Each structure stands twice: as C-alpha cells, then as structure tokens.
Amino acid sequence: MKGINHLVSNIKPSKSGLLLALTASAFSLFTLMIIEVIHRGSFAAFINWADESTVSFVMSFLLLFFLVGALLFLPTIIFISLIAIEVIFWFVVSLGSFIKYQLRGEFFTPADLYALNEGADISTLMSDLIGWKEIVGFVVTLLLLGVFSFFFIRYKKMVSFRKRLLLSVFSVICLAIISTQPSLFTFRSFSKEVPTVESYGKFGFIGAYLTLVEKANIAVPNHYDKEEINKIVKKVNETKTEDVVDPDFQPNIIVVLAEAMWDPLLLKNANFKEDPLPYFRTLMENYSSGSMLTHVYGGGTFNTELEVLSGLSTRFTPEEIYYNQVNQPIDSLAYVLRKQGYHATAIHNFKNWYYTRKDIYELIGFEKFFSMEFFNNPSYIGPYIDDRILMQKALDELQKTKGPDFLNVVTVASHGPYNDIRYKDLPILATSDMKMTELSKYILNLYTNLLKDVDDSIRLLIEGVKEIDEPTMVVIYGDHLPFLGEEYAVYRELDFFQGDLNNYEEYKKMYQTPLVVWDNFGGQSEKEELRMTPNFLGSYILAHAKKEMSPIFRLSRDIYKQGQTIIPKKTFYKQEGVKEAEFQDYQMLQYDALKGKQYSYANRNLEPFEGYVLGNGKIKIDSVQVEKTKNGTYRLDIHGENFVSGATIFIDGEKKKIKFTNENLISTTIKIKGDSSKETSSHEVSVAVLDDDGKTVIEESNSKTINFK
C-alpha cells in the first residue's frame, strides 16, 4: 500500500485529471457490467449484448459516467457514500429484475416502484432463486467498490474544486440529455411498439427502463375537452341496444377471480391420473363459457381484476402496473350496482395492503373489504388461507344481507411459485414421457393438486348458492397462466411453448385463461361460446343481470356486440381484425376517468362509501366484565361486535394476548404485580386489528374505561 501511495503522490497535477477520468470510466464500466451480467444472467450474455448493441452499450456507459461526474464537486466523504449507494442500488434492482423475469417472464418497470411491499412479501417464497453466486457476486462488488473508492479519494483531491465543479455542471447537462432522450440508445424513434422483454434485450437495462419511463407519460388525446366528452357520452346513451334492463330483477352477482387457474390438460405431452378440474369442466360444458385473453403472465393479478371491475383496458395505458393510476374515484361495477340497490363487498384471503387493494376498493365504490386479517382461525394450504374458507365467507355474506349482493371474490391458495411444500404427502397426479427435470415434475404436480382444491372450492360455492335459492349468477375466470418454473420450464419441457413467444399463436397460448358464467335463472337460454379480454367482462355481467349501465360500460358493450371482443397487443391488431380508430371514443373516456377532468362523471355521485370498513363491520365494545381470578390476576371478558381471532386487545395502550370465543366475545388476563394503585385507578380498554408489521392499526374499536376494584 505504501508503494501505491508513493506512486500516486508523485503524479503530476496535469495528469491527475486524466487519471480521475480513467478511474471514473473504469468505475462506470464496472457498474454497467454489474447491471447487465446480473440482469442477463451471465457474463457471456453481457459481452454479446455489448457487441451486438454497441450504441446502447456506449450510451449506457456514458449515462453512468456522467452520473459519477455530476457528483465530483461534492466533499469526498459524501461522494464516496453516494457512489457506494449507486452501486448497491444497481445491484439490487438488476437482481430484482432478473428474478422477476425468472418468475413472470417480465423485467423491471417504472411501476414496480409502486409495488415494493408486494415484491418484498413474495420474495420470502423465492429464497431458492438467490444462491451462492449472487452472494459471492455481492461480496466481490463490495471489495471492488473499496478499490475504486481508494483511487477516487487519491485522484479527486488532486483536481481543483473549480475544475470539478465545471465537470459536474457539464455532466449534469449531458445526464439530462441522455435521460430525457431514450431514442439515443438506438438512434431511432420509439414510436413503434417494442415488447418490454425485447427492448431490455436490445437496449440494455438502462435504455429500456428510460424508454418505459417516457412511455408512461400519457399524452392528452387530441380534442380532449368537456364538449368532446359530453358528445361521446350523449352518443353512447342514445345508441339503441338489444339488452333488456329490468329494475325489478335483482339477482345476486358473484365474480370470482380464480388465482392462476388454467386448464393443465392443454399440456398434451403430460399424462394426468385424473382431471383436476372435474366440477369446473362440467360448468363449462353446460353454461356459457370460453376463454379470456388476459394481458399478464404469472402475476399482475390486480391488472386483470381492475379491468373487469372498471371496464377500462390496460391496452390503452403504458406497460406498467395499472392500479398505480387509480388515485381518485373511478366508475366500476360496485358504483353501478350500488346505485341500483346492491350491497358491494370485496372478499380476498390475502393481505389488505397487497396491490393497495384496501385503498382502491374504497375508491371504486365497495362498502367493505374482507381481507385475510378478518378471517377467524382459518385453515391454510401452505402459506395461504384455504380457498374453501373464502367461499364459505362469500356464502355467509349472501345470507347475512338484505337485498341483492355484488361480491368480488379473489382466491389466493393456488398462487405461485410452486416449488415450496404445501402438502404433507404430494400425490403424483401428472407424469410425462418427455424429458423433465425433477423440479419441473414437482412444480407440475403441486400445481395440479392445488387445482383440485380450487375445483372443490368452486363446487362448494355453487352448491351453496343452490341451497340459498336466490336468483344468482356466478362468473369465474382465471387471471393469468400459472408460473410453472423459471423461463417457462414446464411449458417448454412439455413443448407447450415452442420457439418465439412473440408470434401470435404462442401469444394466445400464453395469455388465454378459462371463463364460465353460471346462473340459476337463465332457464333454457342458449349457451354462449365466450372469448373476450377482461375489459369486456364487466359490461357482459351487467347485460346478463339486466342492469342499467354507465357510459363506459355501455360503450364497452356496444363494441363487444359489434363483434370486437378482443383488444390484443397492438402487434396483433391485424390478426384480430382490429382497427384502432374503433377504440377512439373508448380511449377518450378512459383518459377522462384516469388522467383527465372526469367530465363523463358529471351529475353522478362517485364518492367512496361513507361507512367503508375492513371486515364485517365496525369493531365495537359494548361492555367489559372484570373478574378477579387470583391474587393480582384479572380476567377481562369483552362483549361487543365484529371481533376477529387475529385482533389485539390494548389496555392503556399495552398489547395483551387475546382468547377468541366468537365475533361477540373475546377475553384476556392481566396481572397486577404488587401495585395497588393499578387496582384502584381507571384503565382504557380497546380492540384493534393490526397489519402484519404488528404496528399499523387497520381497524379499531371504541374504548371503554374499567376499574379492577
């Protein structure tokens, strides 16, 4: 080290600037290598990209180089801290993008910044995707970061502050130009639609990401104003329709999103011991059914769900998470049906905050939301609450309310990935003569067994509805194909996906899920063969139930009735016979709802339900009975309403263990250790349901004052 110090100390000031630039260049190349090697999965893939996409490689390097340059004017300790944070940031983000691709066939997008909670939560199920290579890579990164820090410290102080300030100003200007002009990464326009995965392959992580950021800025449509929206709404309302509206007919409407439900019998090279979906298949054979062409694979559930509920299409938005755009009330099935006398309830056996459902369900008009925190002592399949418990909750809700119900039911027990242990003994239901890895065999069998449970939960719901004997329709759809192994392992090993996934036939296979519409009031009505994208399902449901529609659903229905039931990727408009001009009014109303002034909502009260609540209803304490059991120990019996087994009792703000008897009675014990003042003084008792961080209160009761004596 002394030798290096001596060598550095003898460097002439005229050369120090050059050496600082060389160090910054080496550091930028090092950072770029980290990003692309991790993101692409190998060093060889990084070299191939640098050779085949030289322009993108150079622009990525320059952006990182100018990023370092922009920080040169800072004090050394701050400069070193920031470049260390930069390297660690790129390491984590590129690794996250790589893992996302392994799981869902998609890379990191700007909207993933809105889903950090979801990513962190699901990552607990994916620890096997981070192995010794990633750990060694991180350690090596830190060591090399230390080496670069040494040279930066030495060379930086040899360059005057004035020169460093000028370099920083120049770097900021260059950085701004590159960041706001992603077309520089290819020297061409991005007006042509390029699939996200393909853009990451060609333009690199940085270039593709900046491209998506640019696309995320939704331009105001031509001619968008109040007059134009009113003209569209008037035209929609005056369009004649064959659909019958009957205000006196009020069937219950249950919409079931079946997590990752797909027909595995489509895997022709797999041999199944039995059909894992016998009940569901019977429904499809006897009732209107078919397929839904979704826009997500292996994940992105809430995109599909929101399309169904809102009548809007993700095909009119950038390739990003749809729900992050819902930050104000928007029209939905919940609003439309509540206006016609329905109760609107969402039920989901997973966490309230996942996909920010708790907030968005309120914005789109639901009255209450049952999330997993409000299920009492549920049984589990692996890490998830059994869907049969979910269906029983839906049946209970039907019987409890007066008047018609709209239930949005979202399952979760069949959620991927499928390399974990969920059953004590996993029956072998699927085999194949094809060459499959042991992991792929396990994944296929676990998924097949989970489908059996999904099928049984559907049976429980339908048979339960029959017993209630009220006019009811049940719509069941799969939100996306299951994630069956990294890089589509099961699909490829069984030759289901073949070759280029960007061709039309492979596209349909990758995004097509089952759909069925069951009812007990249709009589001998003709069975329909259904094929649609999720945005058309909401208006189909309203028409089938003979309900009035709002403008967005009426327009959706008009387009559907004209035979345009699919809005695919723009790449495949020709194959589907789609003319973009046909969607001009549709896109205009969607912009008005999400980004515009909501002119189309004039004279409509789209205010969230005033009494919106999580769970069955507001938690309420009616009374607290105090009983002394032995010296200094007291038992508290708390009587009230809507208690849940996962609640927490607070006495003077201190958590106490709960004994759950039922929704009207919970208990706890408290020990007073030799403090007579606590026995004679007053104490505040309350009940709350906490988020999974154990701190955040998501629902709480009133408080009651008690005395132990």
What are these regions (language model features)?
Residues 2-199, 619:
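Transmembrane and membrane-interface helices of multi-pass
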Residues 237, 241-247, 258, 263-637, ...:
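Solvent-exposed soluble domains appended to multi-pass membrane proteins
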Residues 180-255:
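Membrane-interface segments at or immediately adjacent to transmembrane helices
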Residues 643, 660-663, 679:
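Extended, solvent-exposed regions of the mature portions of secreted/cell-surface glycoproteins
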Residues 671-684:
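Surface-exposed, short loops/turns at beta-strand junctions within beta-sandwich domains
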Residues 661-672:
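Aromatic sugar-binding surface patches on proteins
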Residues 654-659:
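Surface-exposed loop/edge segments in extracytoplasmic proteins
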